[in-house]
Amino acid sequence: MEKSQPLSEFFSKQLVDPVSDALRSHTCSEQEMTLLESAIVHARDSLLEEIQRSKISEDVTQTVDCLLSRVDELLEETRNFAPISPLSSEAPDILPAMILFNSLCSSKSLDLEPIEIKVEAMENPVVSPPIFSSDDSVKGMPSRKRAKRSLEDTVQMLSKENSVSPPPPSLPFVLPQIPVPIPFSNAALMQRWLGHPLTNPAYLNAMFQHQPAPKPSEEQFAALMKITMHAANFMKTVPQLPVSNHFTESDAEDIKIDVESDEGEIEVSPSPSTGDITENESSSSSTGPMISPNCGDGDCALEKPFICMHNNCGKRFANKFLLKKHMFIHTGLRPHTCPHCHKKFNRKDNLLRHKKTHSPTSAHLGPILPKNPFHGIPQLPVLHNIALTQGFSHFHALKMSLETGATAVRSLS
């Protein structure tokens, strides 16, 4: 207070009074008044900050001096007492008890039962340094004792003394291993869940790999048979649709269906005017059974024993394979489908010839027939897990068509 009184008087004489007199005698505008106010506020803040800094630095200096003096006193007291290290070889009986006690204290979070350890009285008790309270240290703290010593020197000295501690001796027994706690509320339930086979990914993969595929039910199989019969009957009654207007001669050559004429087969080709696939004049104009004029009845019966029993046909063939190929004309079945435009063909070589139109060299050619000409087919029910091969469906349709009136029989010679 004695030092602060002269400073306040000095501040009033040197700064407050002259500035107040100058402001009273000077008339300033609003702009100058604003600038002067900001300058006064800035000077005030600077002075207050400087006063606070000096006060804080003085407090810090006193605190550091007190800490240094207290550290020196503690070092002197520890040198005078010279306690025996608990890990030294002079007290080997207390080592197991101390290690067990430390392990129990570190595992307080585990649900372990308390263990009572009885330690016998030692002949040479360990003398610990006296513990000083904070109140006693504050009361006995000197003001300016050894102020020149820095805190770094004391810290270095303490670190050197602690680094030269003797290594702990080897233990004559094996310490018990404490299990790591499971981070869940119910440890027993978690252990049981981890041992379950459903938590093993290898077990789950093996179970799903060996699981058999579900078999179709009787209702699904019956529905599939009804769909096949409906498709076979529908193919007979479907009218042939006209070809679109952009049908050209080049397109007609690409999709020309050439049935081999060997062994008595006929040739059919699309008509440019109507787009229908018709037979040759020799087969379409005949009203009765077709008999070749170049051979007699006996020769034809021996060489071509298989006869087409379709209405107004009566054509003969040498084997059943040629007869089945011929039946495609009457039944309208086309088992080979183009994967690009979904167009159907009765022979595979015609499909391969048609696929060339979709190659990059002939990409300018557009579709010849519409993708879905059969708009009258009703919506079929959805069947799951039923995979029926394409050959089986075509064979079933051909069999149904043959049973309705186009049965091929071996002629009696």
From Swiss-Prot:
- Cross-referenced InterPro entries, in alphabetical order? Znf_C2H2_sf, Znf_C2H2_type
Q: Where is this region: Disordered?
A: 130-151, 259-290
Mind telling me which GO cellular component terms the entry cites? nucleus
Sorted keywords for this record are:
DNA-binding, Metal-binding, Nucleus, Repeat, Zinc, Zinc-finger
Keyword Cytoplasm listed: no
A Pfam family in this protein?
zf-C2H2
> Polar residues composition bias: which ranges?
270-281
Q: Where are the zinc fingers (C2H2-type)?
A: 306-330, 336-358
One annotated GO molecular function is:
DNA binding
SMART domains from the UniProt entry: ZnF_C2H2
Where is it localised?
Answer: Nucleus
Question: Gene3D superfamilies this protein is in?
Answer: Classic Zinc Finger
Q: What is the protein named? A: Putative zinc finger protein B0310.2
> Which source organism?
Caenorhabditis elegans
Please name the taxonomic classification of the source: Eukaryota, Metazoa, Ecdysozoa, Nematoda, Chromadorea
